[in-house]
Regions:
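Phosphate- and other anionic-substrate recognition elements at nucleic-acid/protein interfaces
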Residues: 1-164
Length: 164
């Protein structure tokens, strides 16, 4: 079981994959004041459903004009998980998995266009058959859920099919 997590600055998503099939998906787009609490709640819900899962998440990075502290919500969201299961959590630099999937690595400019191109890669993988929840998330262009799925998929394909 893999959980992919895309925290985002103002919104985010998480998706649980079992053998490539989406079994749960969460997305959140809270107000600025509630952003971190919503992320923590969403992450806690996902982890409580799948305590044996391996977590793959985008590593916080500093963007021009923004402090790394801006990404404090990510660490609050998954800090307890990381402390409890440090060997079952993997931080991935956004540019690494995006470039390996052929996506544009710029965070904002062509992000949605790149995600739209890569969403078909998730669905066309002959080794998986994502359920309707996943397909709906992609068709509605919920980029946070799609990114969460992509980072989990990247890990599964490049690191040994999501071994526990």
């Amino acid at each position: 079981m893999l959980i992919g997590l895309d925290p985002g600055l103002g919104a985010g998503g998480a998706i649980g994959l079992v053998d490539g099939v989406a079994v749960a998906a969460l997305s959140w787009a809270p107000t600025r004041a509630l952003r971190y609490e919503a992320q923590a709640t969403a992450a806690a819900l996902m982890f409580s459903q799948f305590p044996e899962a391996r977590l793959v998440y985008e590593q916080p990075h500093k963007r021009r004009g923004r402090s790394i502290a801006t990404y404090g919500g990510l660490m609050r969201s998954i800090g307890i998980w990381l402390a409890a299961y440090p060997r079952r959590s993997v931080a991935v630099a956004p540019a690494k998995w995006r470039s390996e999937l052929g996506m544009d690595t710029r965070a904002d400019d062509l992000k949605l266009e790149s995600l739209a191109e890569c969403a078909s890669w998730i669905l066309s993988d002959p080794d998986s058959d994502p359920n309707d929840l996943m397909k709906r998330a992609i068709s509605q262009e919920n980029d946070h859920v799609v990114e969460a799925a992509l980072v989990a998929r990247w890990f599964r394909v490049t690191r040994g099919r999501g071994r526990r």
